[in-house]
Each structure stands twice: as structure tokens, then as C-alpha cells.
From Swiss-Prot:
Subcellular location: Cell inner membrane
One annotated GO biological process: protein localization to outer membrane
Family from the record: Belongs to the ABC transporter superfamily. Lipoprotein translocase (TC 3.A.1.125) family.
Task performed by this protein: Part of the ABC transporter complex LolCDE involved in the translocation of mature outer membrane-directed lipoproteins, from the inner membrane to the periplasmic chaperone, LolA. Responsible for the formation of the LolA-lipoprotein complex in an ATP-dependent manner.
Membrane topology classification: Peripheral membrane protein
Domain ABC transporter: 6-225
A GO molecular function held by the record: transmembrane transporter activity
Keywords carried by this UniProt record: ATP-binding, Cell inner membrane, Cell membrane, Membrane, Nucleotide-binding, Translocase, Transport
InterPro entries noted in UniProt: AAA+_ATPase (IPR003593), ABC_transporter-like_ATP-bd (IPR003439), ABC_transporter-like_CS (IPR017871), ABC_transpr_LolD-like (IPR015854), MacB-like_ATP-bd (IPR017911), P-loop_NTPase (IPR027417)
Subunit: The complex is composed of two ATP-binding proteins (LolD) and two transmembrane proteins (LolC and LolE).
The protein's name in its UniProt record: Lipoprotein-releasing system ATP-binding protein LolD
SMART domains documented for this protein: AAA
Matching PANTHER family: IMPORT ATP-BINDING PROTEIN, LIPOPROTEIN-RELEASING SYSTEM ATP-BINDING PROTEIN LOLD
Organism of this sequence: Sphingopyxis alaskensis (strain DSM 13593 / LMG 18877 / RB2256)
């Protein structure tokens, strides 16, 4: 049985800048299994964000193959890509991107409603996730009334609200102090593992990367051996 959630085969991406072609991804090969937390480590400009955009089906124009849950999503039309993104992928960013006029629980309920969950079910799910992240007393606070660490924990709950197979995180603790970052990351890892998801975490932080199951070092568009 193949338990790979994500498989990348010869993933490539180039951009034109005037008369010059810039190769950002140069044949990336990788795979993630259920329950696995993998660091995508590299400096700024190494192609980390471009790779997450490809895997997250946020952009087209990539060469190679991306398989999510065994399906070659590079062959999908836009409607199928959107459906896969909503049903199978969760996103966590460095900056939380919470809706400012919605409180914590509403921010976690909304993606579930978009996917078709009932209101009561979505609220129960959101309250449970936020409680596990230590936010039981902050459910009805808007983002402006939450600390940076609390905001990021709401973002983690939102990413996991629809029980995604794959979580993509782009510098998820990069805007937090070290102690807060460690707490948020520990909670993130625990939830991902409990859900049986896989997570690909882009970071330039060697210390954070060392705490994950595996490290993919991206340098000039290639995974280093």
C-alpha cells in the first residue's frame, strides 16, 4: 500500500525576465507520507515559496508531476484544482491572514461552511480545535484582541478545520519570538500527527528544521543530497 500523501516528480518552474529565463525549480523530486512533518529548508530566493505555490495548486505553469493522494493533479482543470485545494490541503502562513471582522471561532468555522459543513458541526469542530490549542477562553475575541502567538494558533486551527491530507506551512513561526514559536510549533505538530496528515514546512530556521522528521534542503532550485 502506498501511503504517500504527496509525490513530486521532476518539478520545474521557470520565469521570463525580459530576454532572460530564470529557472526557479530545476527538477525537484520528493514524497511525504501520512503523519510525516518535513522541513523545506533554504535561504530566501531558493524556491521554497514557489514550490509551496505549486504543491498548493495556487499557480499553473509548472513542469513535472504533482501527485496528491495518488492523483496527478497537474492534469486537473481549474475546477478540479479548486476542489482538491479545498478538500485536501490546509495552509499556514508567516502572517496569519485572519479575517479582522470575524472572531477566532468564526475564522475557523468559515472554511468548513465553504466546504459544505453544517453550522453546528462546524462550530463544534472549531471549538474543539481551538481548545486543544489553549484558546478556550479566546473563542469570541477578534484578531486585534489576540497576541501574535494566539493569532497564529487560530491560523493553525483554520488550516486543519477541514481535516486536510496535506498541510503547507510557509515560515509559520517566523514572526514570533523563540519561546512562543516553540509552543505554537509543538501544538501544530501534535495536531498534524493526530489527524494523520502530512506537513511540508518551508523555513530558513535550521533549529526548527532539525525538530522535524526529515529535512529537504533546497538550493538554487534543487534538493541537495
Amino acid at each position: 500500500m502506498n501511503d504517500a500523501v504527496l509525490e513530486l516528480v521532476d518539478l520545474k518552474r521557470s520565469f521570463r525576465q525580459g530576454d532572460v529565463t530564470i529557472d526557479v525549480l530545476r527538477g525537484v523530486n520528493a514524497s511525504l507520507r501520512r503523519g510525516e512533518i518535513v522541513a523545506l529548508l533554504g535561504p530566501s530566493g531558493s524556491g521554497k515559496s514557489t514550490m509551496l505555490q505549486a504543491v498548493g495548486l495556487l499557480e499553473g505553469g509548472f513542469g513535472g508531476t504533482i501527485r496528491i493522494d495518488g492523483e496527478d493533479v497537474t492534469r486537473f482543470q481549474q475546477g478540479e484544482r479548486t476542489k482538491t485545494r479545498r478538500e485536501k490541503i490546509g495552509f499556514v502562513y508567516q502572517f496569519h491572514h485572519l479575517l479582522p471582522d470575524f472572531n477566532a471561532i468564526e475564522n475557523v468555522v468559515l472554511p468548513q461552511l465553504i466546504r459544505g459543513a453544517g453550522q453546528a458541526e462546524a462550530e463544534d469542530r472549531a471549538a474543539d480545535l481551538l481548545a486543544r490549542l489553549g484558546l478556550s477562553e479566546r473563542l469570541h475575541h477578534k484578531p486585534s484582541k489576540l497576541s501574535g502567538g494566539e493569532q497564529q494558533r487560530v491560523a493553525v486551527a483554520r488550516a486543519l478545520a477541514n481535516r486536510p491530507l496535506l498541510v503547507l506551512a510557509d515560515e509559520p513561526t517566523g514572526n514570533l519570538d523563540e519561546a512562543t514559536a516553540d509552543r505554537v510549533f509543538d501544538q501544530f505538530v501534535a495536531l498534524v500527527r493526530d489527524h494523520g496528515s502530512a506537513a511540508l514546512v518551508a523555513t530558513h530556521n535550521e533549529r526548527l528544521a532539525a525538530r522535524m522528521d526529515c529535512v529537504l534542503r533546497l538550493h538554487e532550485g534543487r534538493i541537495e543530497a
